From Swiss-Prot:
Protein name, as recorded: Epsilon-conotoxin TxVA
Family: Belongs to the conotoxin T superfamily.
Molecular-function annotations in GO: calcium channel regulator activity; toxin activity
Disulfide bond residue pairs: C52-C58, C53-C59
Length: 67
């Protein structure tokens, strides 16, 4: 009977412990916001390159014509 109160206290402590996700993260667990941010960054970069290459002065891929 001496162990019974200790057992009850331990059960209460275990039940009130903060829960956590026991699943380990894999490479496929990418937040959706991260994918959206990457897409926005890619589109913004491509648009900047396209605008820059029309002038031809700052794009390394476009040949410099007449300058």
């Amino acid at each position: 009977m001496r162990c019974f109160p200790v057992f009850i206290i331990l059960l209460l402590l275990i039940a009130s412990a903060p829960c956590f996700d026991a699943r380990t993260k894999t490479d496929d667990d990418v937040p959706l916001s991260s994918l959206r941010d990457n897409l926005k960054r890619t589109i913004r970069t491509r648009l900047n390159i396209r605008e820059c290459c029309e002038d031809g002065w700052c794009c390394t891929a476009a040949p410099l014509t007449g300058r």
